Amino acid sequence: MSTSSSASALGRRAGPLDGLIGEIDRALRVLSGAATAARPYPAQAPEAPDALSERERRHAAGLMRVNHVGEVCAQALYRGQAAACREPAARELLRQAAAEEVDHLAWCNERLRELGSRPSLLNPFWYTGSFALGVLASYAGVPRNLGFMAETERQVEAHLDGHLRTLPVQDRRSRDIVQKMKEDEAQHRASAERAGGVPLPAPVRGAMRAMSKVMTSTAYWL
């Protein structure tokens, strides 16, 4: 091979196949539990022995499994939106949000382990569906794309707030994680709005809430 051919091969731009391979690799890391957090684990309160009854432990595990599924969906959704987004600044914002959600994913996974539980068995389904939804959302244009991100974060905030009301008071470790996640989601929503995200039509917001309800109801048990 000539020197010029070698340089051309080494300097080629990443193509669609490279992007696809990268997304598959990321999906496998998310679904296998291999993702690791870049920030410290928020659950710093000591785990008091016998602080939770068996019923409370199962309930806390169910809620944290729902939260874990939410982060799986967020990863896929934002990666799907970014994959088809042609505006560089919006694409970078979506990728940054997805990167920060990796922390939430790892935190929820660790808390499930501490509670003697496991992630949802349906995570491959949630990831695939959310990625496809993200790709579709991106074709609505940048303002709607970012509006979808903002509305997603708004609904997740409300959902986490509900968990803070129902988690056992003595389960400080789960509560610390959920509180930190809620703060991060508020920042993501504000970032999307500042970047030009517009409110979604009421029917779309309602459909998102209905889909979320199906997901949370199923993930609590499975």
Curated annotation (Swiss-Prot):
It catalyses: a 5-methoxy-2-methyl-3-(all-trans-polyprenyl)benzene-1,4-diol + AH2 + O2 = a 3-demethylubiquinol + A + H2O. Binds 2 iron ions per subunit. GO terms for molecular function: 3-demethoxyubiquinol 3-hydroxylase activity; metal ion binding. One of its GO terms (cellular component) is plasma membrane. Its cofactor is Fe cation. It is a peripheral membrane protein. Keywords: Cell membrane, Iron, Membrane, Metal-binding, Monooxygenase, Oxidoreductase, Ubiquinone biosynthesis. Its EC number is 1.14.99.60. It is found in: Cell membrane. Fe cation 2 binds at E101, E153, E185, H188. Belongs to the COQ7 family. HAMAP family: COQ7 (MF_01658). NCBIfam families: DMQ_monoox_COQ7. Catalyzes the hydroxylation of 2-nonaprenyl-3-methyl-6-methoxy-1,4-benzoquinol during ubiquinone biosynthesis. This is 3-demethoxyubiquinol 3-hydroxylase. The lineage of its organism: Bacteria, Pseudomonadati, Pseudomonadota, Betaproteobacteria, Burkholderiales. The gene is coq7.
